[in-house]
Amino acid sequence: MARIAGVNIPTNKRVLIALQYIHGIGPKIASEIIEKVKIAEDRRVNQLSDQEVLQIREIIDRDYVVEGDLRRETGINIKRLMDLGCYRGLRHRRGLPVRGQRTHTNARTRKGPAKAIAGKKK
């Protein structure tokens, strides 16, 4: 198992898919990394040489924000919105949908399980 950016990459999968196990790397960025290292998309992780794994690791460290740094940055951005007291920050603070979705019905994922209200049954 190769270890890149603190994540164990599965060895039996294609490089394009295996790189997506790293938080912050999706299909587009994974294909960009493969292109920079000049690896065929159908190669598997266990077929990579140590030099190629090292190149991938260097490119990710140099060019992309991934894993813990990305999670920290996202958390700081959300905290900043909450401290500002803007609409999006208030929605985060209250645990409601942030991007304009309806809340009269639905939004159960964001709001949590339904709470029983006394006297609601007929």
From Swiss-Prot:
It comes from the Bacteria. Pfam families: Ribosomal_S13. GO terms for biological process: translation. Keywords: Ribonucleoprotein, Ribosomal protein, RNA-binding, rRNA-binding, tRNA-binding. Residues 99-122 are annotated as: Disordered. The keyword Ribosomal protein applies. InterPro entries: Rbsml_uS13_C (IPR027437), Ribosomal_uS13 (IPR001892), Ribosomal_uS13-like_H2TH (IPR010979), Ribosomal_uS13_bac-type (IPR019980), Ribosomal_uS13_CS (IPR018269). GO terms for cellular component: cytosol; small ribosomal subunit. Part of the 30S ribosomal subunit. Forms a loose heterodimer with protein S19. Forms two bridges to the 50S subunit in the 70S ribosome. Located at the top of the head of the 30S subunit, it contacts several helices of the 16S rRNA. In the 70S ribosome it contacts the 23S rRNA (bridge B1a) and protein L5 of the 50S subunit (bridge B1b), connecting the 2 subunits; these bridges are implicated in subunit movement. Contacts the tRNAs in the A and P-sites. PANTHER family: 30S RIBOSOMAL PROTEIN S13/40S RIBOSOMAL PROTEIN S18, SMALL RIBOSOMAL SUBUNIT PROTEIN US13M. This is Small ribosomal subunit protein uS13. The lineage of its organism: Bacteria, Pseudomonadati, Pseudomonadota, Alphaproteobacteria, Hyphomicrobiales.
